[in-house]
Regions:
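Extended substrate/RNA-proximal surfaces in nucleic-acid metabolism proteins
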Residues: 1-82, 140-144
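Conserved beta-strand edge residues that scaffold enzyme active sites
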Residues: 9, 90-91, 122
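Short acidic/histidine-rich active-site segments
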Residues: 113-127
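C-terminal domain-boundary segment and adjacent tail
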Residues: 122-124, 141-147
C-alpha cells in the first residue's frame, strides 16, 4: 500500500496555505516541535485542527517537549489524535533513548498512541535496514499500534 504524506517544517511557522494543499493526503508530519525555534506548541495544536488528514510529530522528542511546556504530552497527543514518528536516521538522541528506556516504552504502550517508524532515507546509501527493523520489532513486541 502506498500512502501520500508531507513532512512540514515548523521553524519558522509554516505557510497558512498548507491545510488546504494537503486535503487529499493520507497524513502530515510536523517536525522538530521540541526545538526552541519551532512554532509555539499551543499555536500548533490550534493549527493542526485545520488539517483533514492524520497528523504526526516527526523528529520530536515528545518527552522533552512535554517537560518544556509542563504538559502531559501523552494525553495531549491522544486527545488530539496525533501519532509519533520514531526516526531511525541516527540524528536524533530520542530514538536511542526510546529503544533502551523501558519506562518510556511502557508509557507509550499504555497510552495507545500510534507510532510510525521513519528513516529520513533520501537515497539508497542512507537506508538503515537494521535500525528500521529493530524499531518495528520493538513496536510489535510492545503491541504499540501503527497510525
Amino acid at each position: 500500500k502506498v500512502l501520500c504524506g508531507l513532512e512540514i517544517g515548523t521553524r519558522p511557522t509554516p505557510p497558512e496555505s498548507l491545510p488546504r494543499a494537503t486535503e487529499n493526503f493520507d497524513y502530515v508530519l510536523f517536525e522538530c516541535l521540541d526545538d526552541t525555534r519551532a512554532i509555539d506548541f499551543y499555536e500548533f495544536l490550534e493549527w493542526r485542527k485545520l488539517f483533514k488528514c492524520k497528523a504526526g510529530l516527526a523528529h520530536t522528542d515528545i518527552f522533552k517537549l512535554g517537560e518544556r511546556y509542563g504538559l502531559d504530552i501523552i494525553k495531549i497527543l491522544r486527545d488530539n489524535d496525533i501519532f509519533w514518528e520514531l526516526n531511525t536516521s541516527g540524528n536524533y538522541i530520542y530514538y536511542y533513548d526510546f529503544l533502551t528506556n523501558e519506562k518510556k516504552q511502557q508509557i507509550i504502550k499504555e497510552s495507545g498512541i500510534p507510532v510510525s517508524v521513519g528513516s529520513d532515507t533520501h537515497y539508497i546509501a542512507e537506508y538503515r535496514k537494521k535500525q528500521i527493523r529493530r524499531a518495528n520489532e520493538l513496536l510489535q513486541k510492545l503491541n504499540i499500534p501503527l497510525p
